Amino acid sequence: MLARRRFLQFSGAAVASSLALPLLARAAGKTAASAPTDAALTAATDFAALEKAVRGRFGVTLLDTASGRRIGHRQDERFPMCSTFKSVLAATVLSQAERQPALLDTRVPVRDADLLSHAPVTRRHAGKDMTVRDLCRATIITSDNTAANLLFGVVGGPPAVTAFLRSIGDAVSRTDRLEPELNSFAKGDPRDTTTPAAMAATLQRVVLGEVLQLASRQQLADWLIDNETGDACLRAGLGKLWRVRDKTGSNGEDARNDIAVLWPVAGGAPWVLTAYLQAGAISYEQRATVLAQVGRIADRLIG
């Protein structure tokens, strides 16, 4: 409760730019001693300083689901979703399955022509078929791109996912193309983008809200907690006080993202953390280190 009170006090106040802390040393693994209140006072400026240190563009939202308050950096700017869209794609499938009970067990052919370069699960099933349920699991847990495209075919294409987003109150996020084209991004092009704030609200709705039935929410949460691609990202910076359900995304060029629902092990309301990074001046592995640092900043504030 102390951490949540600190967060509420901080998120309702403006933070002057003079409070910014240099984050370059911290990103390399060093820490600075600070009182609990210091963590609250410096979180937003820490995010901005981290962005400056990596010479990129960085958006983050930390949402307290108990109060609706949030803090972050560039929360309302558009970023390419990359594979973080797959959480919403799976939610779209689950929503349709609530009206079509046999959908998750429907078998979908996996053709050689369907296979993309990142197809760790579907490649093993080429020439055979997979259930929609197994395709969802593959695209969330291993970020299998072929599975994602096959699921687009199941639900009605990218426009159907955007329609689902609009139906649950997300007027910002959108899916327009298939893998791998959806990963390309140019400034001013809204295709296949979201904002940190919009995705935080959407993740809250589909995992914690009532837009999906309880069984569907539990299924989505189970897939997210089994995710195999996020250990070096937000999870790496969050302490053992949290059970993390997340979905990562990257484009292999400059973007690396991670979105997560954080459940306190000790109980209490969850938090949602979304982080979108564009930093072409650093390596793929270094981008993961930046996301881990975001986890540390969040953990310092709410842990």
From Swiss-Prot:
Signal peptide: 1-35
Coiled coil start-end: none
Molecular function via GO: beta-lactamase activity
Keyword set includes Signal: yes
Enzyme kind, highest EC tier: hydrolase
InterPro entries: Beta-lactam/transpept-like, Beta-lactam_cat, Beta-lactam_class-A, Beta-lactam_class-A_AS, Beta-lactam_L2, TAT_signal
Keywords from the UniProt entry: Antibiotic resistance, Hydrolase, Signal
SUPFAM superfamilies membership: beta-lactamase/transpeptidase-like
Modification(s) after translation: Predicted to be exported by the Tat system. The position of the signal peptide cleavage has not been experimentally proven.
Annotated positions binding substrate: 247-249
Active site: 83
Reaction catalysed by this enzyme: a beta-lactam + H2O = a substituted beta-amino acid
Pfam families linked: Beta-lactamase2
Enzyme Commission code(s) on record: 3.5.2.6
Any one Gene Ontology BP term: response to antibiotic
Note: The class A beta-lactamase family has a specific amino-acid numbering system, sometimes called Ambler or ABL numbering and often misspelt as Amber. A multiple sequence alignment was used to derive a consensus sequence and then the consensus was numbered taking into account insertions and deletions. This allows use of identical numbers, e.g. for active site residues, despite differences in protein length. UniProt always uses natural numbering of residues, hence there appear to be differences in numbering between this entry and some papers.
Family: Belongs to the class-A beta-lactamase family.
PANTHER family: BETA-LACTAMASE, BETA-LACTAMASE-TYPE TRANSPEPTIDASE FOLD CONTAINING PROTEIN
Protein name: Beta-lactamase L2
Species assigned in the record: Stenotrophomonas maltophilia
